[in-house]
Amino acid sequence: MEKTQSVFIRFIVNGSLVKQILIGLVAGIVLALVSTPAAIAVGLLGSLFVGALKAVAPVLVLMLVIASIANHKKGQKTSIRPILFLYVLGAFSAALVAVVVSFIYPSTLILVAESADITPPSGIVEVLHGLLNSIIANPIHALLNANYIGILAWAVGLGIALRHAADTTKALINDMSDAVTLVVRVVIRFAPLGIFGLVASTIAATGFGALQLYVQLLVVLIGCMLLVALVVNPLIVYWKIRRNPYPLVFACLRESGVTAFFTRSSAANIPVNMEMCKKMNLNEDTYSISIPLGATINMAGAAITITVLTLAAVHTLGITVDLPTALLLSVVAAVCACGASGVAGGSLLLIPLACSMFGIPNDVAMQVVGVGFIIGVLQDSAETALNSSTDVLFTAAVCQAEDAKLANPDALAAGKSV
């Protein structure tokens, strides 16, 4: 009996987190089918898990970035620029996929519900204005409100200032960073319980009956996201690492995408991505910045959502649009979505702005937002899974490509001579 108990405890504490999450997923579905009141009640577990992730993520980002920059040695290489380039390339590629698929399989909407209680941004200037204001936010306010642009700005500034600090100060910062990382690991071990609660309560509260009216729209949306995750992203990664990208792609989808799918927040998934980068032995100076930055600005999924829903509204209203205009829409949508990917459902608030490019009235555009919330059970989950798993995928691809260059000086010299 004791031996059996010991094996069970070992599985809980040290077992595969992915297997435990799958068990929690199945158990949540079963409970929702068996008892709706019980399933809604265990939703508390999901709320606590997501709340814990959101609580620890800002502190984790602040401490990791400060520690990373403060201890940065002169001449030590980081690879932020190549990762940012991949983020941009991935977002525009996703937008292009959404445009092409929307023209091949045009969707229409049933515009009945309005969402008058939501105030979307009035234009791209307002979006960029808000983004710039986020950079100069009060550090305490940024931590309390999970403003990752502001947190990164302060962390970078403090990190640079602390480069000249005494070694004992730097050691203290490292110890604080390690302590926060340990807390994060403990929180992540509760992921199976959190997923169990989220799945059970979501299915019990909403079901999937409302989604039947929008089957084609969902097929186009999720089809675009799968195409980006399984075709476009692997092509980008292959271009970077020059070997089979799928082991890395599937690892990122399995360990980052699954959790992000249920938390529906790129910000809440930052600790999961950080832990995965650490397991892969990536450069901490790089991933401590690229992961939180990606949670805010890497918006491939948001670009797909905005483009597909806006073009669905265009097709519904019978507006004729040419391919260059549709592509311009996707570019504008991708730029505007910057800063919205860290908020559950944030990309939907940019739809009225995108619709305004085609002269669609705001009241009609808000009905499109209403449709977005109806399908949000799947749309927002799939979007977040794509966004968050892409953060760690592109970070790993760039870090591994840099490691390969360092391991092969001849190839590096040949690259310089070209």
From Swiss-Prot:
Domain of life: Bacteria
Molecular functions (GO terms): neutral L-amino acid:sodium symporter activity
Catalytic activity: L-serine(in) + Na(+)(in) = L-serine(out) + Na(+)(out); L-threonine(in) + Na(+)(in) = L-threonine(out) + Na(+)(out)
Main localization category: membrane
Topology relative to the membrane: Multi-pass membrane protein
Family listed: Belongs to the dicarboxylate/amino acid:cation symporter (DAACS) (TC 2.A.23) family.
Protein name: Serine/threonine transporter SstT
Organism: Yersinia pseudotuberculosis serotype O:1b (strain IP 31758)
Gene: sstT
